[in-house]
Amino acid sequence: MEPRGEKSGEADGVRVTPQLLKARSGEFALESILLLKLRGLGLVGLGCLGDCLGLEWLDLSGNALTQLGPLASLRQLAVLNVADNRLTGLEPLAACENLQCLNAAGNLLAGPAQLQCLAGLRGLERLRLRDPLARLSNPLCASPCYWASVRELLPGLKVLDGERVSGRGSDFYQLCRDLDSSLSPDPGAPGPRPMEAQPWVEPGYWEALPPRSSSILEEACRQFQDTLQECHDLDRQAWDSLAQAMRALSPAGATAASFVF
């Protein structure tokens, strides 16, 4: 899915001001801001954002931005999220020499030429141009050679669209891509039609079974009641025997009051 359609026009949009930046960050000076989250504010311009010279982490996703000019002065910026905007180019990011992670999914980047500006960023290791879970993409992602062209343009990437392309674990992702390619049907290739899916179990397998007879439980209860009655009888007999023994051992003329228990 491409980025959202018509957003509010620039006349109705929000622009970045010093007051907005200080309120969102809690800092008193723009140079002191290290982390800034401006997601989903309807921003149409970045205003004085370029004055935040110490900024290292920035989230501008879900706005209506068409250009990133002020970001060219952010030399300390390491993590940038500009997903779900209206960007057709990323040229100002060429000056962000410390950029390591970039999310630009859900914009209007038409081809690899729009990524050429990132080729000089030696520290860029993570790039996202499409996000299937969020249904965000770019026009260039529809090209059959998208993956290969990005890899060729940015050989230093370790993770592309959430998949590791180099380093530990990259072989696994490559194997998954190869399997997907081999299993993808070719419309022009002849071959047998796939078999119709069949149920795994017989009809009625999941239906509730009729209740079983409770004769075993009833017999167990009856035996328990009989045993309990025998215990009561034995208890009564024991008390009778004890009373007889006490009477036999008591001296002549002694009364019940003479026994202390």
Curated annotation (Swiss-Prot):
GO terms of biological process kind: outer dynein arm assembly
UniProt LRR repeat ranges: 54-75, 76-97, 98-119
Gene Ontology cellular component annotations, sorted alphabetically: cytoplasm
Domain LRRCT, first and last residues per copy: 138-183
InterPro entries: Leu-rich_rpt, LRR_dom_sf
Keywords attached to this entry: Leucine-rich repeat, Repeat
Keyword Ion transport: no
Residues forming coiled coils: none
Protein name: Leucine-rich repeat-containing protein 61
Organism: Bos taurus (Bovine)
Encoding gene (name): LRRC61
